[in-house]
């Protein structure tokens, strides 16, 4: 079964180049350029990945689903692992998630980070609040609801494509709809990596958090 690494990327820096060179064509890599204006990084990784590009920034959810559609149309038996472009996911962790998904084809596998005093306060607090609200509204216990490192097999592709949301709220919607669709999930411990002040992230603390909590409240009604 083929492992496919999917990376949505908006204005990435050289950390994406480093990741792709580390992978070094050992696995199939698909990068979705979500309307970036600077193409230098994409030029640097063209020998290490298949790149899908479009002109306007559509959001992470849209980029993920664009990649999913391409994979569904071009592959049959596979496991997809979604990684972020900011260098905060470890390749070994990604492959561990793939290994579990390969043996559990009907399960969404989620990378679970742990936070300590070295973790930025805003990240630590935000994840704790989201975890509490998510459990309160859904009854599901997921420790790391905001983890972008996730893997699943071809059996869940139609589910992943059916989920609404074009930006960061998409990843939360994937979790919110698990229960009503009787889809299993499993969390696996991964490294918690924060590079500098997390400046590579394009997550808007206010705007994107508002959309995420809005979706949680909507699903609980």
Regions picked out by a protein language model, each given a short descriptive name:
Residues 50, 54-56, 62-70, 91-168, ...:
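Acceptor/aglycone-binding surface of glycosyltransferases and processive sugar-polymer synthases
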Residues 77-88:
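Short beta-strand-to-loop acidic/aromatic patch adjacent to the donor-nucleotide binding site
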